[in-house]
Curated annotation (Swiss-Prot):
Residues 123-183, 249-274, 592-668, 765-815 are annotated as: Disordered. Residues 595-611, 640-668, 783-809 have a biased composition (Low complexity). Residues 135-154, 174-183, 612-639 have a biased composition (Polar residues). GO terms for cellular component: cytoplasm; nuclear pore. It comes from Dictyostelium discoideum (Social amoeba). This is Putative uncharacterized protein DDB_G0279765. Residues 765-782 have a biased composition (Basic and acidic residues). The lineage of its organism: Eukaryota, Amoebozoa, Evosea, Eumycetozoa, Dictyostelia.
């Protein structure tokens, strides 16, 4: 039987769902499965079973559960819950032994009655006289029983016990299976789950106070069934389902539901969602689905084991406030068994006691019992109209995924976001599936949902929902600058870091008037001990996209570049103004100085980026490792009114060069400065030659074209131009004072931020490629070794099987 034919649905179960049984005759075949009657409910023991490792088939496949039903006897539960997960567990009801024997006898009687009816039907069809019904011998699969008819009464006597079976057959008989549910299986138990802080709940029970609610109605971590797309957030994130306690407004809710039925479907759905959105009672559901086509109101929520135990599968989201992480949480499970005609008939009480109980005054009896485990307590209350039990399950709330975000690093208009991920779980690995960035308008970030209050008639806004999304691709370009790509797997106590680049696009669109943007960093991850994946949303403040009405430039070049090899820097120029521009790019001819760090330090930092870890310096982390397109940041321009033309600009550059050369005597003179460590006798031709070499290498980056005429650029259009550079030394260098001159309006535009170029030697580049090739080869070799081992094991197994078969054949021949 497939998993889609079995059901256990707790969501929305109510007393009215079982009203169809009130008019059903007692002798009908729909009453062949009693469920859990009142006597068994009071005397049974309850146990909460949370599997240590999640198995999807054990939660959804009926046949797989039946084959592994022995796991319900030796229950090894985990003592922790993960923040944001969909916790799937089982509540096992273990009736007493007397009840189990009574149920077996009832099943035997039902089997006999069914076989007698089948025999009578077969005899009537063949028109033959019925044989004397002195004894009925059942098949080997059914129990061996003899039915004798004396004095109009039926007595059931067992035959003599057969000889004890061998040990193998005894083990097969001891194995537990899942019984197939009958068509009358019904949910005669209702569950209410409350999550409380353990210390607060224990204090509230002693002082008769209500414990504080720790549910987070706008959770930071939530469970999602499907992966998120880039243009929306899953509805399960913005519509978290919670039940409210409807003890005071039951009649009002029924009237509201009747009124909603006359309205449109959209209004009906929204009202239904709001009516059960807030409260201390968490809505629970179960993965099984089974419904009788003839009875649409049927909602069974359990399955029975062959030993007589009942199993109720339940799933509940763990959405708890972040302040309660790493603390002991108490899950309070209140079990209600509402009475109806069917339950009264199933009870062992006589009619007189039921009538007296129905007309008696309200009275309750409280009782409490403790199980063998310290973390599980059972209590109960018996009322005249329903019976309740309470189960307490303690667990520790953990969050194994620790995330650290740093976004205070900017290069031009580009925001560099450093993301550090850490797996704090001691034993399980974490698989990080995706990491994305979503932008929100501040004014639409939080929207309130109006719901009905519990204690008063008026409605109050209590829930905050996530606001509307801004399409990221229209305003920003997001890229991952790290070497490794997702998904990745983090082992216990391991860390992983990456750098995300967020930069505005060259062609901007009109934005809605807002104060700014909120950024959500979305991280989806999976852990083997939990079901599905967890979606974590972290808030991050981003800068507003720079808006200009003149020019915007973005650069594209290879990084790192190879020593003594020419490379191109591509300038993409967008004319955002309403007028025509005739542009020329000017590169300053002065000596381009090296950045603050020395070349040896740069080489050490570059080598540290090969392991996938990013350092605190965003320049090294973004430029090391591999060739990245659109590496340069989008650079905005300052408009400068100038009365001089292009020639004056070159004169200014020469003056600046003169100032820099005056500050450094080595650049303007060939005389060596006298220092305390240098003696005049040491001056020789060799020292002068070494000085000339240093002087020549001070030009670290050489531009082969000082000026490039771009030409006319129409309004709202873009154009690109490439300029060649030649690196002469290893390090990280800056290209400063790049200007654009508009000959029509005679305006000079200068770039705010310099371009940064990283240059490495060919040997260093070859080492990186060799290391990457070695890693790939090692992984391939491991896979090949594993495959070879599997092939060898399979061959050995086949050889062993063949040898065993040959031995068996030889033994038979000898016999």
């Amino acid at each position: 039987m497939s998993s889609s034919t079995i059901s256990a649905m707790l969501m929305g179960a109510a007393d009215g769902d079982l009203n169809y049984l009130n008019s059903t005759p007692i002798g009908s075949s729909l009453l062949d499965d009693m469920g859990l009657d009142e006597d068994d409910f009071q005397s049974s023991s309850f146990e909460v079973f949370i599997p240590e490792s999640y198995d999807s088939k054990f939660m959804s496949d009926y046949e797989y559960i039946s084959k592994n039903a022995n796991r319900f006897m030796k229950c090894k539960s985990r003592e922790y819950a993960i923040q944001g997960e969909l916790l799937k567990f089982f509540i096992i009801v273990r009736p007493p032994d007397d009840s189990k024997k009574r149920q077996k006898q009832q099943q035997i009687q039902q089997l006999l009655q069914q076989k007698q009816k089948q025999i009578l039907i077969n005899q009537s069809n063949t028109s033959t006289p019925p044989p004397p019904q002195k004894s009925i011998i059942t098949n080997s699969d059914s129990p061996r029983l003899i039915v004798s008819d004396t004095t109009s009464t039926t007595k059931i006597e067992e035959q003599q016990p057969p000889p004890p079976p061998p040990q193998e057959e005894q083990q097969e008989q001891d194995s537990i299976t899942v019984l197939q549910p009958s068509t009358s299986s019904s949910s005669n138990l209702l569950f209410e789950l409350q999550l409380r802080l353990a210390s607060d709940y224990e204090k509230s029970t002693k002082e008769n106070q209500n414990p504080l609610n720790i549910i987070d109605y706008n959770p930071k971590h939530s469970f999602v069934n499907t992966e998120m797309k880039n243009d929306h957030i899953s509805s399960s994130k913005s519509a978290t389902s919670y039940l409210r306690q409807n003890t005071l407004n039951v009649n009002n809710n029924k009237n509201n539901k009747n009124q909603n039925n006359n309205n449109n479907n959209n209004i009906e759905n929204s009202n239904n969602t709001n009516s059960r959105f807030i409260g201390d009672v968490v809505e629970v559901s179960s993965p099984f689905t089974f419904k009788d086509t003839s009875n649409p109101y049927q909602k069974p929520n359990f399955f029975r084991l062959s030993n007589g135990d009942l199993v109720f599968p339940i799933e509940v989201p763990i959405y708890i406030r972040e302040i309660n992480e790493d603390k002991l949480i108490t899950m309070v499970i209140k079990i209600n068994r509402p009475k109806n005609n069917r339950n009264n008939i199933a009870s062992s009480d006589n009619k007189l006691e039921r009538l007296i109980q129905g007309g008696a005054v309200d009275k309750s009896v409280n009782y409490t019992m403790r199980t063998s485990t310290a973390s599980l307590g059972v209590g109960g209350t018996i009322h005249n109209n329903k019976v309740t039990r309470t189960i307490l399950k303690n667990f520790t709330l953990i969050q194994p995924m620790k995330v650290l975000l740093q976004s205070n690093t900017t290069i031009g208009c580009k925001n560099l976001i450093c993301v550090s991920l850490e797996n704090t779980h001691p034993t399980s690995n974490i698989t990080i599936k995706s990491l994305d960035i979503y932008l929100f308008h501040v004014l639409n970030m939080e929207s309130t949902t109006i719901i009905d209050s519990v204690s008063s008639v008026s409605s109050i806004p209590t829930h905050r929902q996530i606001g509307n999304l801004v399409k990221v691709n229209e305003h920003y370009v997001i890229s991952n600058l790290s070497n490794h790509r997702l998904p990745i797997e983090l082992e216990p106590s391991n860390q992983y870091s990456m750098v995300l680049s967020v930069e505005p696009s060259s062609i901007q669109k009109t934005l809605q008037p807002t104060e700014g943007f909120h950024t959500k960093v979305e991280l989806s991850w999976h852990i083997p001990c939990s079901s599905g994946q967890v979606l974590s949303l972290y808030e991050l403040r981003a800068q507003n996209p720079p808006f200009t009405t003149n020019l915007m430039i973005s650069t594209d070049y290879k990084s790192p570049v190879i020593l003594n090899e020419k490379f191109l820097v591509k300038f993409n120029i967008s004319n955002l103004s309403n007028s025509l521009k005739n542009l020329t790019i000017n590169i300053p001819p002065s000596i381009i100085k090296q950045n603050g760090s020395s070349s040896s330090n740069n080489n050490s930092k570059l080598s540290s980026t090969n392991s996938g870890q990013t350092s605190d310096n965003p320049i090294n982390s973004s430029n090391g490792g591999q060739s990245i397109k659109k590496q340069g940041s989008n650079l905005s321009l300052n408009r400068q009114q100038s009365s001089t033309k292009l020639n004056n600009q070159s004169n200014n550059n020469n003056n600046n060069n003169a100032n820099t050369t005056n500050q450094n005597n080595l650049n303007s003179s060939r005389y060596i400065p006298v220092e305390t460590t240098i003696q005049f006798s040491e001056l020789s031709n060799k020292s002068l030659l070494s000085y000339e070499e240093i002087q020549r290498n001070s030009v670290n980056l050489l531009c082969l074209e000082k000026s490039v005429h771009i030409g006319p650029v129409n309004s709202k259009n873009s154009i690109s131009a490439s300029i060649e550079f030649l690196p002469l030394s290893v390090g990280i260098f800056e290209i400063q004072n790049i200007t654009l001159y508009d000959s029509i309006e005679q305006i000079t535009y200068s770039l705010k931020e310099p371009l940064q170029i990283c240059c490495v030697s060919r040997e260093h580049n070859n080492e990186e490629h060799n290391n990457n090739n070695k890693e790939n080869n090692n992984e391939n070799n491991k896979e090949n070794i594993n495959n070879n081992n599997n092939i060898i094991n399979n061959n050995n197994d086949n050889n062993c099987n063949e040898n065993n078969n040959n031995c068996n054949e030889n033994n038979e021949e000898i016999k």
